[in-house]
Amino acid sequence: MIIHPNFDPVAIHLGPLAVRWYGLMYLVGFIAAIVVGRIRLKLPHVAAQGWTAKDIDDMMFYGVLGTVLGGRLGYVLFYKADFYFSHPLDVFKVWEGGMSFHGGFLGVTLAMVLFAWQRKRHWLQVTDFVAPMVPAGLAAGRLGNFINGELWGRVTDPNAPWAMLFPGAMRDDAAWLSKHPALVEKWHLADVFMQYQMLPRHPSQLYEIALEGIALFFVLFFFSRKPRPLGAVSALFLIGYGLARFTVEFAREPDDFLGLLALGLSMGQWLSLPMILAGIALLVWGYRRRPVNAAA
């Protein structure tokens, strides 16, 4: 078993200002997205559409607003609506954590629609250009989750090579023991807990880096190197992310205040299903519509 390093959540201190790893990873993610975007400017079919480095910089401004506002509101509405309706001022306490990818996705989509309207472009042309830039940011964000030792995975066999002990999960681990007696006996978890006061879990943040970040990046980057029908790159992102997130959720610990929902699926899985379906519909629409020269 591997013990999570339990990093200090503060990366650096600048006088009275504490720069946290999670915020730093957001910055790294946006910078990585800009780098990917500038690489894409060199593709002939992208350059032919008149994209410039300034467009990317302006787009990132919209993207930051969409990510932060949408991510926070999505968490409030999708995950803890009852709490925040009772404590509305707590919505603004972003330093206490609480961001939703699906909310951030909706926020960024709306931001890109606004950007497209201002630049008099088709909004799908904008999202097709942006889609390959997103996985780099997702990977950085999940790395921030791992450094913080949060959003850990479900309990697993202590003999599994991926088994990891998360100090931040101690309280959850103690409660888990009484709820799953069969697995406690099967995996001899009582002995493990006696020794470490923790239970072995999937490092699901690393799975998400691998699937939602690295794998999805390469799929989108190489798919978009050639001209594609309008909406095709965006559709592949929806399908790819939705499938990756849906899969990883089987290894990720559900939010304790929600648990598993209908059909034994998590909130993340239920929110990913519409993405997959929308992606399939958009892909079919794009290829039926053609023309390839409209692609990003």
Curated annotation (Swiss-Prot):
Entry's Gene Ontology cellular component terms: plasma membrane
Function, in words: Catalyzes the transfer of the diacylglyceryl group from phosphatidylglycerol to the sulfhydryl group of the N-terminal cysteine of a prolipoprotein, the first step in the formation of mature lipoproteins.
The UniProt family comment states: Belongs to the Lgt family.
Reply yes or no: does the keyword Ion transport apply: no
GO molecular function list: phosphatidylglycerol-prolipoprotein diacylglyceryl transferase activity
- Keyword list, A-Z: Cell inner membrane, Cell membrane, Membrane, Transferase, Transmembrane, Transmembrane helix
Membrane-spanning residues:
17-37, 59-79, 97-117, 129-149, 203-223, 230-250, 265-285
Mainly localized where?
A: membrane
- InterPro entries linked to this entry: Lgt
- Where, by residue number, does a 1,2-diacyl-sn-glycero-3-phospho-(1'-sn-glycerol) bind? 142
Query: Source taxonomy lineage?
Result: Bacteria, Pseudomonadati, Pseudomonadota, Betaproteobacteria, Burkholderiales
- According to its UniProt record, where is this protein located? Cell inner membrane
What this protein is called in its record is Phosphatidylglycerol--prolipoprotein diacylglyceryl transferase
Please give the NCBIfam families that the UniProt record associates with this protein.
lgt
Entry EC number(s): 2.5.1.145
Species of the source: Burkholderia ambifaria (strain MC40-6)
Q: Which GO terms describe its biological process?
A: lipoprotein biosynthetic process
